[in-house]
């Protein structure tokens, strides 16, 4: 095989509850993921060793590592170790999902790499084995593999499918700068400690609200807008106050609701329909906010025929 092309989606967390800090430094979460039509493209070519380059796409990749710390390289090495494959791969990635933006772009790269290398190398691992490898790479990698709409528990990597009917329209606003996921979680812990007398304690076993599942099942954007929630939104805004301005701007210009995606700083605005999404996109663009429209749910990582 000369090359394999795999496309994997970014995601939005339409709901996210975060439990208290565990003794191992992690948090239990309960989240509702939706895969969006903002994709990462990974092309895998035969090679003697494992390497990655970035080409095309719409994201500045100049600061991204290309050594063994890159998540796509880690994915290829993990698959090679698991299967005993002794060759290599040259990975070429077109990035469209913002870096450190809360949309799982690096996770999409890793998921796409697992699928691409499995096909290129002929290792033919089953879906469950690929999911197990994905979970070892990061909490969001399994979802990038399966796509659609799903509930994530544990670190977010234990997935169960969630029925979502119809199509949801989103306008994604890319706030300036980047936010490190560990930094946002640490800020959440500090916020809870500072305001322990004012806010309810974190649920030790968080769950997704029934209203979220009902709205997704009904395919009702207005209903979903009422229940969008993210425990990481307040700490993300505290670290990057400009997020609050973007949220206000989108909602003033007709979005049903806005939510910080994951650990931010990307803000996802839910629109009533395509026309509403276009109106929000135009208004935010006029205010010099970088935006893109997307729909969901979409498929997870899969091989394309070029």
From Swiss-Prot:
Top EC class of this enzyme: transferase
Active site per the UniProt annotation: 11, 140
Binding site for ATP: 98-108
Gene Ontology BP terms: isopentenyl diphosphate biosynthetic process, methylerythritol 4-phosphate pathway; terpenoid biosynthetic process
GO molecular function: 4-(cytidine 5'-diphospho)-2-C-methyl-D-erythritol kinase activity; ATP binding
EC number: 2.7.1.148
Keywords of this entry: ATP-binding, Isoprene biosynthesis, Kinase, Nucleotide-binding, Transferase
The keyword Nucleotide-binding appears for this protein: yes
Pathway stated in the Swiss-Prot or TrEMBL entry: Isoprenoid biosynthesis; isopentenyl diphosphate biosynthesis via DXP pathway; isopentenyl diphosphate from 1-deoxy-D-xylulose 5-phosphate: step 3/6
InterPro entries per the UniProt record, alphabetical: GHMP_kinase_C_dom, GHMP_kinase_C_sf, GHMP_kinase_N_dom, IspE, Ribosomal_Su5_D2-typ_SF, Ribsml_uS5_D2-typ_fold_subgr
SUPFAM superfamilies given in the database record: GHMP Kinase, C-terminal domain, Ribosomal protein S5 domain 2-like
Keyword Transferase recorded: yes
Reaction(s) the record says it catalyses: 4-CDP-2-C-methyl-D-erythritol + ATP = 4-CDP-2-C-methyl-D-erythritol 2-phosphate + ADP + H(+)
Family per similarity comment: Belongs to the GHMP kinase family. IspE subfamily.
Role according to the record: Catalyzes the phosphorylation of the position 2 hydroxy group of 4-diphosphocytidyl-2C-methyl-D-erythritol.
Name assigned to this protein: 4-diphosphocytidyl-2-C-methyl-D-erythritol kinase
Organism listed in the record: Leifsonia xyli subsp. xyli (strain CTCB07)
Underlying gene: ispE
């Amino acid at each position: 095989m000369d090359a394999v092309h795999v496309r994997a989606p970014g995601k939005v967390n339409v709901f996210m509850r975060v439990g208290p800090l565990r003794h191992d430094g992690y948090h239990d979460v309960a989240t509702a993921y939706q895969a969006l039509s903002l994709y990462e493209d990974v092309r895998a070519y035969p090679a003697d060793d494992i390497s990655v380059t970035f080409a095309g796409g719409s994201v500045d990749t100049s600061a991204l590592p290309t050594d063994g710390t890159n998540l796509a390289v880690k994915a290829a090495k993990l698959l090679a170790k698991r299967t005993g494959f002794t060759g290599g791969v040259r990975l070429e990635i077109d990035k469209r999902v913002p870096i450190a933006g809360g949309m799982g772009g690096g996770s999409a790269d890793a998921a796409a790499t697992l699928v691409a290398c499995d096909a290129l190398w002929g290792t033919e691992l089953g879906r469950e084995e690929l999911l197990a490898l994905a979970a070892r790479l990061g909490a969001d990698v399994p979802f990038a593999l399966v796509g659609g709409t799903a509930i994530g528990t544990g670190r977010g990597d234990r997935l169960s499918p969630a029925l979502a009917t119809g199509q949801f329209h989103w306008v994604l606003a890319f706030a300036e700068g980047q936010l490190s996921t560990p930094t946002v979680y640490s800020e959440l812990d500090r916020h809870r400690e500072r305001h322990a007398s004012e806010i309810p304690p974190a649920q030790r076993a968080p769950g997704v609200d029934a209203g979220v599942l009902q709205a997704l099942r009904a395919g009702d954007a207005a209903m979903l807008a009422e229940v969008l929630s993210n425990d990481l939104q307040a700490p993300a805004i505290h670290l990057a106050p400009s997020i609050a301005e973007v949220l206000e701007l989108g909602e003033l210009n007709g979005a049903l609701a806005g939510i910080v995606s994951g650990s931010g700083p990307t803000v996802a605005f839910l629109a009533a329909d395509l026309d509403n999404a276009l109106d929000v996109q135009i208004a935010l663009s006029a205010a010099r906010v970088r935006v893109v429209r997307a729909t969901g749910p979409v498929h997870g990582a899969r091989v394309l025929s070029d």
